[in-house]
């Protein structure tokens, strides 16, 4: 919802936004509604999404938000299905859970796929600051750093894809 709000506030002329979300265990409509109630300032956005949220079955679902030229793509499958798609991302928001809780997300193979699916100067962020996550992102080719977090999170991991001789090999 915040991405949508920021897009709407900062959109240039006829710009378009494609937001792709991989959801291995999508929340029920009831649970989403309960979460959204805590964010009153985003009420208009949440009402639209709740009205249009797809059923929870494994598939690729699309919601077009015509007024703001946003194509929301909800992939109800785990992130390892990324290999079946063809796109380049400017930004990734990764699972913030501990690698022990969601090991599928934190593999060298997936880090390399994320790198290959990221535009030059594209970024990635996650609440996970585990050493093997940072090392895996580095090994994949990202420039990685720990940056100040917010709320109860002291630090987060931030990575960016920069051009280098290694990335062109």
Predicted features along the sequence, with ranges:
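Short beta->alpha hinge that forms the Motif I/post-I loop of the SAM-binding pocket
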Residues: 22-24, 106, 129
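S-adenosyl-L-methionine
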Residues: 33-86
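A short SAM/SAH-binding and catalytic strip from SAM-dependent methyltransferases
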Residues: 79-80, 90-105
């Amino acid at each position: 919802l915040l991405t949508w709000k920021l897009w709407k506030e900062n959109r240039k002329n006829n710009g378009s936004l494609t937001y792709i979300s991989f959801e291995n265990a999508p929340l029920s409509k009831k649970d989403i509604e309960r979460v959204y109630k805590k964010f009153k300032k985003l009420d208009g956005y949440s009402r639209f999404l709740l009205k249009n949220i797809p059923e929870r079955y494994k598939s690729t679902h699309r919601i077009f938000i015509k007024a703001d030229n946003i194509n929301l793509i909800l992939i109800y499958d785990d992130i390892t299905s990324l290999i079946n798609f063809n796109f380049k991302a400017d930004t990734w928001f990764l699972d913030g859970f501990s690698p022990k809780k969601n090991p599928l997300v934190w593999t060298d193979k997936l880090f390399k796929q994320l790198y290959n699916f990221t535009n030059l100067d594209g970024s990635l962020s996650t609440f996970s600051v585990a050493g093997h996550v940072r090392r895996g992102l580095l090994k994949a080719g990202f420039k990685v750093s720990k940056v100040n977090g917010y709320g109860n999170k002291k630090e987060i991991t931030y990575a960016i894809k920069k051009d280098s001789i290694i990335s062109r090999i």
